[in-house]
Regions:
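Short glycine-aspartate micro-motif
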Residues: 85-89, 145-149, 211-215, 221-223
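Hydrophobic beta-strand positions
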Residues: 99, 155-156, 224
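Glycine-rich phosphate-binding loop and adjoining helix at the ATP-binding site
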Residues: 110-210, 351-362
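Conserved phosphate-binding catalytic cores of ATP/NTP-utilizing and phosphoryl-transfer enzymes
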Residues: 61-85, 188-211
Length: 400
């Protein structure tokens, strides 16, 4: 279905069809006259192309517009029944799945499903088997699934389908291997970039042209939208803010270097600082659990914020201040409409957001930052799997 209008039409018409679909993806319904005006193309040409898109199943006539007297024009939008997209956010110990219709509406969402990710073919075969079982439980046929989007941490090349953090050394890209198992197109993406796209299309990034999404989880990542387009960079690896050499410390990052921003501004930094303070004898509602020898998790620390635990607040605020300085630099460079803070640490809410904003006020250029909003993610932990669905739809239609 993805190639229906990409192959059998001339290049100009294919480009116009893509632009029509791009407008529809913004979740706004259009009349023929609206399309004509936006694309600066004649009404007869637009009428013909919209008719072909309806025939292909991508677009639907949604009825007549408005309540004015006289002949009312038809309005058009994406056809939800064109098929389904499955988006998967894969973590080391769990995964989350969203299923959307073609319009991007979520029809199913499940999170924190137990799964052990290792870089082997058996691990990814197990993931494929689970996904096939999952869609069967939802009552969907394999043929109804138009594409799968798979989010992975680390370095991912969206165009080639390779992951450079998992499945290393195999002669085929992960995407190709999974396509053979799932019998549908598979698009892999870096988790932060997918979260960024999900927030941009379906969250608080809607209606802005330039956005930076900062994923503060165990590690630190970033997605960037410039002039309404997701930024990939030359090799597809843009957004590695966690490895910006900003800090003067001796902490060895997971990448093997020292001084990386991630070592001072991430969930792992909060956890490391919290455990260090407990060892020094600082008081916390988690002190007894620590003394018993039980594991203190990052979620334990985040949950302690709700009880106004001073040590947890101190550690989160420290990270927020460091992160805010880095975001101030990003604002000075990109001058975005919006900065969104998401990921696991976003559930810290104002304990993280307020020190970020304070540091931005101190370290950014006021003339640059005064028009930039800084907000917490609207989609929360759904941003990843929803972003995977929306990115896969755009990739399927040749819009990326």
């Amino acid at each position: 279905m993805a190639s229906t209008f990409l192959n059998n039409v001339n290049e100009k018409n294919a480009a116009l069809k893509q632009q029509i679909l791009r407008l529809c993806i913004s979740d706004v319904d259009y009349t023929i006259a609206d399309f004509s005006r936006e694309l600066e193309c004649s009404i007869p040409t637009i009428t013909k192309l919209v008719s072909e898109l309806i025939e292909d199943g991508f677009i639907k006539d949604l009825g007549k517009a408005g309540f004015s007297s006289g002949r009312r024009p038809s309005i058009y939008g994406l056809n939800p029944a064109a098929g389904y997209i499955v988006g998967v956010d894969v973590r080391r110990r769990h995964l989350s799945i969203a299923v959307t219709d073609f319009k991007g509406q979520v029809v199913d969402y499940q999170s924190d499903i137990a799964f052990q990710l290792v870089g082997t073919s058996d691990s990814f075969k197990g993931l494929c088997d689970y996904l096939l079982e999952h869609i069967q439980k939802l009552g969907l046929d394999k043929e109804e699934v138009l594409a799968y989007g798979i989010n992975l941490t680390g370095r991912v090349n969206h165009n080639t389908g390779y992951s450079y953090s998992y499945f290393i050394g195999e002669d085929k890209p992960i995407a190709t291997v999974m396509e053979q198992q799932l019998s549908a197109p598979v698009f892999i993406e870096n988790d932060s970039r997918a979260m960024c796209y999900g927030e941009y299309i379906a969250g608080c990034g809607a209606r802005v042209d330039n956005m930076v999404f900062v994923n503060v989880s165990w590690g630190l990542g970033m997605g960037i939208v410039i002039n309404r387009k997701l930024l990939y960079g030359k090799s597809g690896f843009s957004g590695e803010i966690g490895h910006f050499p900003m800090l003067d410390n001796d902490i060895i990052c997971q990448c093997g270097k020292v001084g990386c921003l991630e070592t001072g501004a991430s969930g792992s930094a909060v956890h490391r600082e919290f455990i260090k303070k407990l060892k020094e004898g600082k008081a916390s509602i988690l002190s007894e659990k620590f003394r018993s020898g039980a594991e203190i998790t990052l979620d334990d620390i985040i949950n302690a914020l709700a009880d106004e635990d001073m040590l947890a607040i101190e550690c989160v605020e420290r990270v927020g201040n460091i992160l805010g300085r880095a975001i101030a630099g990003l604002i000075n460079i990109f001058n975005p409409d919006l900065v969104v803070v998401g990921g696991r640490m976003a559930s810290s809410k104002d304990y993280l957001l307020l020190p970020i904003k304070s540091a931005i006020n101190k370290h950014s250029l006021n003339m640059v930052s005064k028009d930039t909003s800084v907000e917490m993610s609207k989609l929360g932990k759904k941003a990843g799997p929803i972003g995977a669905c929306l990115l896969s739809r755009s990739s399927l239609l040749g819009l990326m």
